[in-house]
Amino acid sequence: MLYHVSPVAGLKTLQPRVSTHKVGYVYAIENLVTGLLFGAKWDDFDFILSTDKNGNPVICECYPDAFKSVYQGKTCSVYFLNDEGFQRNKTSWSEELVSENKVQVVEEHVITDLYNRLLDEEQNNKLIVHRYEYCTEYRKTISNHIVDRLIRFEIDLSNISESDNRFSKYFRAIVTELIQITDGHLLP
């Protein structure tokens, strides 16, 4: 059994959607707790997501209280799916399975309090959450991650601070410095 978790309730069929992979996929996952992390909208500027040696999801907050701000007050639906037609290793994330075809939902479970459910999973050692730390090593890791994603995703640095409050609140200095070092003045 695979899982697809969404903030949208009541789906009977999942349709392929084009995302960052630029191909229409239905996304699924084997680990329910990892799936629950996708029950609210977030991206690489909120968390770094990985897995530990036991396959448990590990998230690192990219700014203070990211976990709480993303998940508190959210509900989601867990869709149970048969694994037929799903493929592994079609994306860069090994935990992710995809299907290029529409997929019938076998069952739906509604999670009415996603934040508290994830806190329970953390208490049960099924989820590791690294809250934002004000130490140099942690901040260096987050800074490197943010810079990598800004460049990799070809984000328009000139407008991002106005269009996304995370950048004006938490990442303004990184964006300002990147604009300065990428404007060409450092080259002969």
Question: Can you describe what each PLM-predicted range is?
Answer:
Residues 1, 26-27, 76-79:
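A broad, low-specificity signal marking well-ordered, structured residues that form hydrophobic/aromatic
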Residues 1-23, 40:
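ADP-ribose/NAD+-binding catalytic cleft of ART/PARP-like enzymes
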Residues 4-10, 30, 81-86:
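Short, flexible beta-strand-to-coil junctions
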Residues 12, 36-37, 87-89:
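Short catalytic/ligand-binding loop motif for oxyanion handling, primarily in non-cytosolic enzymes
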Residues 20-44:
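Extended catalytic/binding region for NAD+/ADP-ribose chemistry, centered on the ART fold
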Residues 22, 41-188:
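Conserved NAD+-utilizing ADP-ribose enzyme module
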